[in-house]
Amino acid sequence: MILLDTDVLLDVALDRAPHAEASAALLELLERRPRMAFVSWHTVANFFYLARPSRGAQQSREFLTDLTGFVSVAPTDTEDLRYAASLALPDLEDAMQVAAARACGAQYIATRNVKDFRKSPVPARTPEELLEELG
């Protein structure tokens, strides 16, 4: 199981070079392995907020709808928020990603911001690293 961080989705949706290629390849690989990938609830909101100015509301919604064909939203609750708040991560949003990853049983968090997750109990990997590992 893999939790996708917001930056991976934005790389694909906004075609952000040079990262779009690896992020798109990871999504394509996960599409062939349904229900192996998750996003957090707040990733959906963050994605929409950040993608809408470039893609527009309709295209941003369509991207998210297409994504839900093979990606699930991690089931989180109050206990997961408490867990996130207890983590020794400087950014609460990153801690919430870790809590969501734990809640869905993810083995990895797919992100370009690996350094932000150094103290995470769920290891972070770049899309390139995950492509190599999952091949």
Name every feature range the model reports, one short phrase each:
Residues M1-F38, R52-E62, K119, E133-G135:
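Short, well-structured N-terminal submotif of metal-dependent ribonuclease cores
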Residues V71-V114:
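Active-site neighborhoods of divalent-metal-dependent phosphate/nucleic-acid chemistry enzymes
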Residues R61-T65, L81-R82:
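Short, well-structured alpha-helical segments
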Residues M1, F70, R102-G135:
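Acidic, PIN/NYN-like endoribonuclease modules and their adjacent C-terminal/linker elements
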Residues V8-L9, N46-F47, Y83:
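A general alpha-helix detector
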Residues S40-A45:
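Short, conserved active-site loops that position catalytic residues or coordinate cofactors/metal ions
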Residues L4, F38-V39, P75, T111:
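Short beta-strand scaffold positions
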